[in-house]
């Protein structure tokens, strides 16, 4: 098994919800017969964690912990000479003839198209094959969506990357031949800080164009404490990025 895939499986099961919560619940059940008090404590802790992580109050707070990025405006473009849109995921959609971009990728493409129209900058889409054997690449799916739904054509396709670090290094290789060292980077808010760090490492200065900027948590309202699957998914994404940021700091 590929070590990168194995690492992702371990992280998903042991560190990220809902996998980590399921593991904790199973552990609580297993030990409750021999150590009832400890087992109940684990079960209650996992249940409370599941509720909290399923609220927008917690998912929004976690997202804000990943960085501090304002909405993009054309005046912020500075020395940028290109727009880089990062892939996220893909879906099997028979109504679209097979593979197509997933919801997160589509959100990034939508903002990337808006930035392109506001600035006139050319677009690079970055994303390899989601799984071995997939065809086409995510970059090719993004190109198709930009053409069909936004009437835009990316100038460059980076089709080999498998993670954010490779998004950065391989995009930099392409843009270096065009003497471009500053880009507008389009990705989700909670993914932005780590992405910008990796792009800087690769030699590209990035101007942030974040998608899905967290809402304000004050004043407190019912919608922020009502559990929802979407909030749990957002908590998972934010925790994934916080772990990634911590790993980057440990590397240096």
What is the predicted function of each stretch?
Residues 41-56:
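Hydrophobic membrane-insertion alpha-helices, especially the h-region
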Residues 2-10, 58, 62-66, 239-246:
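Hydrophobic alpha-helical segments of integral membrane proteins
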Residues 23-24, 55, 59, 252:
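Alpha-helical transmembrane segments of polytopic integral membrane proteins
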Residues 55-228:
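A structural signal for short, hydrophobic/glycine-enriched beta-strand patches
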Residues 1-31:
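Membrane-embedded alpha-helical segments of integral membrane proteins
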